[in-house]
C-alpha cells in the first residue's frame, strides 16, 4: 500500500495463517514491515502466508503458539524480540466462534473456551508486548472485534458477541492507560467477511446476509487488512480508543 509510513517497523500478528490475519500479514509485508506470524493449528497455511510476505518484499518469522496460554505468549514475544530487536505493532486477530450454543444449554467450559480464545488472548498478548513498547515510547495495538459486539451476533452466538464486546472495552481502557507512553490502541469490527472463519461459522450461503447489508455484498479480508494497516502505520498517530467498522453499512452506529 504505497503512501503509508511504517519507518522500519516490526509487527506481531496473531492468528495469521488464514483470513484477515493472513491478508494483514501480506499487506504489512508490502509496506516493508518485518512480520512475526503467529499460528496454532495450520503450519502448512502459515508457511504459505510467510512465503507471500517474503514475495511481497517483507521479512517473516513463523511462531507456533497457543495465545490462550500465557507462557506460550510470553515465549512468542521473546522470540520475536530476539529475531527483530523490538515489537512496534501488535495485531490481536486470533479468535473464533468455537460453536453455537443456546445460553440455557451452555456449560461453563464452553463459556470459558470462547472467552479464553477471543478475550483472554488479547489480554495475554497485550500484557506481554506492552513493556517493549513502553520502553521505546511507541506502539500500535489493533484488536479485531466484530459487528456481533454491537448487534448481538447471529443465532446462538451470545457468548461470542460478549467476548467481542469485551475486546472493545479492553481497547478503550488500554488506550487511556497507554496514551502517555506513545502507544495507540484501537479495534476493528468487521461485518460479514469472506473468510474461512465465516465459512465454518455460518450455515447456508452468504446471500442470507445481503438484505441487511446496504452495499449488497460481503467484505473481503483485504478490505479489513487495509484498515488494520492504516491503524498500524505512523499516519494514524492521533487515533486511539476507537472502534472502526468494516461492514458495508450493516451496522450504522
Model region roles, listed by residue range:
Residues 101-103, 107-115, 141, 209:
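Substrate-binding pocket helix/loop in short-chain dehydrogenase/reductase
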Amino acid at each position: 500500500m504505497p503512501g503509508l509510513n511504517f519507518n522500519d517497523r516490526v509487527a506481531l500478528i496473531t492468528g495469521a495463517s488464514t483470513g484477515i490475519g493472513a491478508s494483514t500479514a501480506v499487506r504489512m509485508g508490502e509496506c516493508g514491515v518485518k512480520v512475526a506470524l503467529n499460528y496454532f493449528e495450520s503450519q502448512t497455511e502459515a508457511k504459505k502466508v510467510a512465503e507471500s510476505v517474503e514475495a511481497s518484499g517483507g521479512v517473516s518469522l513463523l511462531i507456533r503458539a497457543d495465545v490462550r496460554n500465557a507462557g506460550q505468549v510470553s515465549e512468542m514475544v521473546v522470540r520475536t524480540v530476539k529475531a527483530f530487536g523490538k515489537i512496534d505493532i501488535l495485531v490481536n486477530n486470533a479468535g473464533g466462534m468455537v460453536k453455537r450454543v443456546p445460553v440455557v444449554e451452555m456449560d461453563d467450559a464452553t463459556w470459558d473456551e470462547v472467552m479464553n480464545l477471543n478475550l483472554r488472548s488479547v489480554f495475554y498478548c497485550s500484557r506481554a508486548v506492552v513493556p517493549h513498547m513502553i520502553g521505546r515510547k511507541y506502539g500500535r495495538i489493533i484488536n479485531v472485534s466484530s459487528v456481533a459486539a454491537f448487534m448481538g451476533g447471529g443465532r446462538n452466538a451470545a457468548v461470542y458477541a460478549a467476548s467481542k464486546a469485551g475486546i472493545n472495552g479492553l481497547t478503550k481502557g488500554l488506550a487511556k492507560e497507554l496514551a502517555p507512553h506513545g502507544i495507540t490502541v484501537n479495534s476493528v469490527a468487521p461485518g460479514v467477511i469472506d473468510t474461512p472463519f465465516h465459512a465454518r461459522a455460518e450455515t447456508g450461503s452468504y446471500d442470507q446476509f445481503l438484505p441487511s447489508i446496504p452495499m449488497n455484498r460481503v467484505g473481503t479480508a483485504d478490505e479489513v487488512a487495509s484498515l488494520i494497516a492504516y491503524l498500524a502505520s505512523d499516519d494514524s498517530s492521533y487515533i486511539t480508543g476507537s472502534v472502526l467498522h468494516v461492514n458495508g453499512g450493516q451496522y450504522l452506529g
